[in-house]
Each structure stands twice: as C-alpha cells, then as structure tokens.
C-alpha cells in the first residue's frame, strides 16, 4: 500500500473519494514543532547518560525554530505536484527535485545562530562548514540523500541535515494538493519526499490508535497499519521489545523476515513523546536490538552513521 498525492485540479475529476476515514498523510505543522522538540530534548536530557548530546541537539532544534521565522519560504508547488503525480513520484523527491540556494541560506543562518552556543570541536565543525564552498555543500547534501555516509563526516551531517530538513519541511507545509491511499509499493519511504522515517507513533486524539511513520527529512507523517513491518510489509514474524514493562511508551518492532526494526512511540502511554527526541534519547534500546541481531531501518537526523558503520 503506497500513498499518492493528488493535485487540487484533479480532485474533482477523480472518480474516487479522497476524504478517507483514515487520513493517509499528515503534513507538517511547523508552528512550535522545533520549539516542542527542543523542549522535549532538554527534558529527556535530565538523568540520561546521553544528556550532553541531547542538549546539543536541543540547541540545533531551537535554532531551526528561529531560522524558520527569519527565512520564510514562498513557493508555488502546483506544477511540481502535477508533474510528480503524472510520473508516480513523490512531489519533493530528494533524488529528483533540484535544490535552490534557499537551503544554503538556511544553513548559514543556523550556523550564525549556533556559533555563540558552541565551543570546542562542535564550534570547529560549524566554522569549517561556514567556510565551505557552495559546491562542497551541494556535494555533501547529495551524498546524504544517496546514503553515502562515508562521504560526510558524522559531526557535519547533523548541521547539513538540519538545513535540508528545514527547507524540505517548509516546502511540504506548502503543498496545496491532498493525499489518497492507493495500492502500490514502497510504503517504507515518505510519499512526499522519498526519505525514510525516524520512528513511528501511535496517536491519540482525532487519529486515536493509528500508527504514522514520521519522516526524518520533511516532517510529514504517513499512515501504516499496525502489526505490519514498516520496512518489508510482512506480518508473520513481528516482535515488540522494550527496556521497561509491556506498558512502555517506547518499543521496538522487529521483523524476522527482513531483520530490521523500527521504534514505535505510544502517545497513550506518554502524550509528550516526540518522534525525533524520544528516538534519540532511547539509544540503549537500539543497542539491545543490535545485540539481538536486528538492523535499524531508520535514521535519526541528529545521529548519522560514520564511515565504516
């Protein structure tokens, strides 16, 4: 089951209803998204062995909030959505969509916002990025989108991704089309940009009990039914792991068929869970899953694989 985005001018022509009982897509609501993430990271940093890194990630998230409002994006995506629908591709496909200079402007603004807060190695990293040429930055961005993580040091990647993510999230929030679920493949990829999830969340409220995967780039969420592997869509050999009780707010769903796992966050157990922050703060669970022989099917935007990983 994949999700296709239908342009506005095609909705009335469609012979299928698009107002499903279950919303297939939840486009990013950028107001307070980054502030909420930063606050959650700071909260989780208390009594966490990774506290220093969580506070570091909170600084980046807060900078994203500031830069978001300093550099709003105005763009008409109507033609892009129509062309992508005709090609059967995500409208903001990371492998196809040309990047303009806006994302590099966001990066430089993030660096300016973060420099007073950084010291030591972290300061050296962002000063190095500040001096990089536009082509060097584009090369690193392309490498990250191609999952060529050996080409970008793991200390630079979070800063570059923070700018790219902000750019893609701004675009995703402007999409004028609507979404509808249609049969197909590749449900493990974001239907808006083609990136991968950071984690999944079982919602409360209007989408009570529904699971949505959260994109690690454009912040869109897309529906995937529960008790199905989000990577290979098999249901035969799924298991759920937690470091606490069966009522834990964070679990890992493992699949014996493809050998991967993805974390599931339960708002019913903790309404404050946040897909990026809580994933990053629960790396002990990742270590346990690695011991059990499972590979992570997602990437956290604050933690990229290093060379050889």
Curated annotation (Swiss-Prot):
Q: Where in the cell is it found?
A: Cytoplasm
Main subcellular localisation: cytoplasm
What InterPro entries does its record include?
FdhE-like_sf, FdhE_C, FdhE_central, FdhE_N, Formate_DH_accessory
Q: Which family does it belong to?
A: Belongs to the FdhE family.
Question: What's this chain's function?
Answer: Necessary for formate dehydrogenase activity.
PANTHER family reported in the protein's UniProt record: PROTEIN FDHE
The protein depicted here goes by the name: Protein FdhE homolog
Lineage of origin: Bacteria, Pseudomonadati, Pseudomonadota, Gammaproteobacteria, Enterobacterales
UniProt gene name: fdhE
């Amino acid at each position: 089951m994949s999700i296709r985005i239908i342009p506005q001018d095609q909705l009335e022509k469609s012979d299928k209803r698009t107002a499903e009982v279950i919303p297939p897509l939840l486009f990013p609501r950028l107001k307070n998204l980054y502030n909420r993430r930063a606050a959650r990271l700071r909260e989780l940093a208390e009594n966490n062995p990774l506290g220093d890194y969580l506070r570091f990630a909170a600084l980046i998230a807060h900078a994203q909030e500031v830069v978001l409002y300093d550099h709003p994006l105005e763009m008409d995506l109507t033609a892009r959505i129509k062309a992508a629908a005709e090609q059967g591709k995500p409208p903001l496909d990371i492998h196809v969509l040309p990047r303009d200079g806006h994302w590099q402007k966001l990066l430089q603004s993030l660096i300016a916002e973060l420099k007073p807060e950084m010291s030591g190695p972290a300061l050296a990293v962002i000063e190095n990025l500040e001096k990089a040429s536009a082509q060097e930055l584009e090369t690193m961005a392309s490498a990250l989108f191609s999952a060529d993580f050996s080409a970008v040091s793991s200390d630079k990647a979070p800063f570059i991704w923070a700018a790219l993510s902000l750019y893609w999230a701004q675009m995703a929030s402007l999409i004028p089309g609507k979404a509808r679920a249609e049969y197909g493949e590749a449900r493990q990829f974001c239907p808006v940009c083609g990136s991968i999830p950071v984690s999944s969340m079982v919602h409360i409220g209007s989408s009570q009990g529904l699971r949505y995967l959260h994109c690690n780039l454009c912040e869109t969420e897309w529906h995937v039914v529960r008790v199905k592997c989000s990577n290979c869509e098999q249901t035969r050999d799924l298991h759920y792991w937690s470091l606490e009780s069966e009522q834990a707010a964070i679990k890992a769903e493992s699949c014996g068929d493809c050998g991967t796992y993805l974390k599931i966050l339960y708002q019913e157990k903790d309404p404050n869970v946040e897909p990026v922050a809580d994933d990053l703060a629960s790396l002990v669970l990742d270590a346990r899953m690695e011991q059990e022989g499972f590979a992570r099917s997602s990437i956290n935007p604050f933690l990229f694989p290093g060379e050889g990983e």
